[in-house]
C-alpha cells in the first residue's frame, strides 16, 4: 500500500476555562504531529481554519498481529495552542496503521468467522483475560506485563477481555499494541438480564461512550462484543422472568450499542454477543457460523 489516510477531528471542550472570554476562541489553533515507528517526525501541521482534516501518510509501515509481521506504531500528538505559543492542552497516543474486520464469507459448511488484518485472515490463538486479582488495587502495569508476556511465550496472537470482568486500564491495550495481541473486547455484561429503565440506559450509554473514546485508537482493538453468553441463554429463557427482559435485551445489544458504535467507533467491528451467529436469536450455538462456547471440554 502506497499511502493511508487519517481522518483528524479534534474535539475542543471547556475553552473558557483556559483562555477567558468566548471572544478569544478564535486565537486557538490545533497543532498536529506524527512520528513514525523509528522516531522520524513525518507530519507537523497547524490546523487553524478547518480542524477536520484528512492527512496522508506515504509508504506506511503497517501493524500486524504477532507472527504475521511487525508491530509498527506511530506516535500521534495533538496540541491546542494559543497564538502566543502557549500549549493549552495535549493529546498524545500511539496508533497502528492497519485494517481489522471479521471475514464472514459463506462457505460449504456455513460461514467463516475469521479475524482479517490488512486483508489477511489470521489463525487466532488466545484465551480469555479475566480480572487478574480479586483486589484490583494489586493489579499493576508490572503484573499485567508479566501475564501478557506469558501469553506471548505461549504463542498467543489474540486475547479476549471477558464481559464478566471490567474494562482494563490503558496500559493493558498499550501492551497488546506492542506485543501484537489482537483484542476481542466484550462490553461489561455477562450471564444475566437487565431491566432497561431510563436511568439504566443513561448510565450504560455514558459508560459505552467513555470507554469507546478511551480505547478506540488502539491498533490491537479487533472487535467489540455486546455481552458474554446472554443471547443464547435469553433465547433459552434462562434467567428470564418476564417478556420485557427479552425486549430490553434486543434494544440494548441490537439497537443502542450498534448506534453508539456507528457514532463513536465506526471502524471497529461489532458483534452482538458471544456465542452468536450474528444476533436476533438466530441459533447462537450454531457450530458452523459465528463463534461457539464449547463447555464439554471442562464441565
Segments and roles (model prediction):
Residues 1-158, 288:
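Secreted/periplasmic carbohydrate-active enzymes, especially glycoside hydrolases
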Residues 158-178, 182-299:
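Substrate-binding/catalytic cleft of secreted carbohydrate-active enzymes
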Amino acid at each position: 500500500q502506497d499511502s493511508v489516510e487519517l481522518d483528524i477531528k479534534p474535539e475542543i471542550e471547556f475553552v473558557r476555562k483556559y483562555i477567558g472570554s468566548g471572544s478569544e476562541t478564535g486565537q486557538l489553533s490545533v497543532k498536529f504531529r506524527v512520528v513514525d515507528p523509528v522516531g522520524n517526525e513525518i507530519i507537523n501541521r497547524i490546523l487553524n481554519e478547518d480542524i477536520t482534516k484528512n492527512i496522508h501518510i506515504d509508504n506506511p509501515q503497517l501493524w500486524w498481529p504477532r507472527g504475521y509481521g511487525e508491530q509498527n506504531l506511530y506516535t500521534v500528538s495533538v496540541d491546542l495552542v494559543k497564538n502566543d505559543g502557549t500549549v493549552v492542552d495535549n493529546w498524545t497516543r500511539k496508533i497502528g496503521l492497519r485494517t481489522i474486520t471479521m471475514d464472514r464469507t459463506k462457505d460449504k459448511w456455513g460461514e467463516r468467522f475469521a479475524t482479517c488484518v490488512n486483508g489477511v485472515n489470521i489463525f487466532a490463538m488466545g484465551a480469555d483475560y479475566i480480572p487478574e486479582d480479586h483486589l484490583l488495587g494489586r493489579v499493576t502495569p508490572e503484573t499485567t506485563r508479566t501475564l501478557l508476556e506469558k501469553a506471548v511465550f505461549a504463542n498467543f496472537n489474540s486475547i479476549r477481555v471477558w464481559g464478566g470482568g471490567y474494562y482494563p486500564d490503558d496500559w493493558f491495550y498499550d501492551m497488546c499494541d506492542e506485543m501484537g495481541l489482537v483484542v476481542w473486547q466484550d462490553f461489561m455484561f455477562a450471564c444475566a438480564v437487565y431491566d432497561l429503565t431510563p436511568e439504566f440506559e443513561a448510565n450504560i450509554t455514558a459508560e459505552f461512550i467513555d470507554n469507546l473514546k478511551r480505547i478506540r485508537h488502539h491498533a490491537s482493538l479487533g472487535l467489540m462484543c455486546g455481552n458474554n453468553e446472554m443471547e443464547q441463554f435469553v433465547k433459552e429463557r434462562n434467567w428470564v422472568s418476564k417478556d420485557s427482559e427479552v425486549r430490553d435485551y434486543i434494544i440494548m445489544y441490537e439497537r443502542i450499542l450498534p448506534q453508539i458504535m456507528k457514532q463513536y467507533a465506526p471502524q471497529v467491528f461489532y458483534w452482538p454477543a458471544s456465542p452468536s451467529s450474528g444476533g436476533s436469536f438466530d441459533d447462537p450455538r450454531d457450530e458452523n457460523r459465528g463463534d461457539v462456547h464449547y463447555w464439554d471440554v471442562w464441565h
